[in-house]
Amino acid sequence: MSVPSIPIVKQQFSPKFPRLPSSSLYPSSQSQNLNVPSGAFHPISIVHKEVCSSSCKRIWCSSSSSSTAEPKEGHEVRAQVTVRRKKLGVFVSGGGTNFRAIHEATKRGSLHGDVLVLVTNKSDCGGAEYARNNGIPVILYHISKDESNGSDLVDTLRKFEVDFILLAGYLNLYQWNDPSLQKIYIQHSSITSSSFWRQGIHGMKVHKAVIASGARFSGPTIHFVDEHYDTGRILAQRVVPVQANDTVEELAARVLKEEHQLYVEVVEALCEERVVWRQDGVPLIQSKENPNEFR
């Protein structure tokens, strides 16, 4: 979608945490107020691969893991700026299928980042099990009544030098008073009416509500997180038709399939610094192929 009439303000969406000495990169398992399973922290090999960043002046960019990637014939290369590989922290409360999709994308090289840590409030959930099986540190974290801003967790994430927090099926709300801690969140919703996901409806209940409402379309929505539930700026959506004879399970399966693909595409854009902001504060994703196109 071209947006020629509204000026685009290119902003770096890469908050940087204070760098710590390498000896303190991985936090101790005795962190205060953090129940970290023994042996959970294992060094993760970070493979630095060069890609060129997306900017309004750039014509070609490749996120390929190959260092010999070349621009397509007929494309002019005007600028190539190296973008470092991003460090990701993922939060889950359940099966973690979106987390798996993101991690698999990092392994196959289509996503210019690495999952360094998983945070969960349920130690036996599927997402935590997957993380442990893949050598990803797991932090079990429950916020206490006298510690409402999550400062312990913020400090731990800083030690991992996390660039982005990805909430993938994580339902707890923490009011972190830290503007440098950037978060995005995925939520099942009806794209024709945000009321389904702003009433605290989650999981299969949202698909049931969509069908009961008579809505003809549903789909996943990805938005930034603010201090309230489901009120952050929408970053991406995808349309999923609701069939006349859909069951809740059938609709949920189709939405989930699109959700996995959309979330990976959004994280790819974040890692390649292709998220830009209109002057009215609306976030857009810049096209890889044409920097003048946004969606």
Swiss-Prot record:
**Which residues participate directly in catalysis?**
H188 (proton donor)
Q: Which PROSITE patterns match?
A: GART
Any Gene Ontology CC annotation = cytoplasm
Show which residues form the site (Raises pKa of active site His). Answer: D230
Q: What species was this sequence derived from?
A: Glycine max
Specify which residues bind (6R)-10-formyltetrahydrofolate according to the UniProt entry for this protein.
L171, N172, L173, Y174, D230
In this chain, N(1)-(5-phospho-beta-D-ribosyl)glycinamide is annotated as bound at: G96, T97, N98, E259
Pfam families, sorted = Formyl_trans_N
Q: Which reaction does it catalyse?
A: N(1)-(5-phospho-beta-D-ribosyl)glycinamide + (6R)-10-formyltetrahydrofolate = N(2)-formyl-N(1)-(5-phospho-beta-D-ribosyl)glycinamide + (6S)-5,6,7,8-tetrahydrofolate + H(+)
Identify this protein by name.
Answer: Phosphoribosylglycinamide formyltransferase, chloroplastic
Fill in the transit peptide range: 1-62
The record's InterPro entries line, in alphabetical order, gives: Formyl_transf_N, Formyl_transf_N_sf, GART_AS
Per the record, the similarity remark reads: Belongs to the GART family.
Gene encoding this chain? Answer: PUR3
From the UniProt record, give one GO term of the biological process aspect: 'de novo' IMP biosynthetic process
Pathway(s) this gene product operates in, as recorded in its UniProt entry: Purine metabolism; IMP biosynthesis via de novo pathway; N(2)-formyl-N(1)-(5-phospho-D-ribosyl)glycinamide from N(1)-(5-phospho-D-ribosyl)glycinamide (10-formyl THF route): step 1/1
- List its EC numbers: 2.1.2.2
What is the annotated localization of this protein?
Plastid, Chloroplast
User: In which tissues does this protein get expressed?
Assistant: Highly expressed in young and mature nodules but weakly expressed in roots and leaves.
Q: Which GO terms describe its molecular function?
A: phosphoribosylglycinamide formyltransferase activity
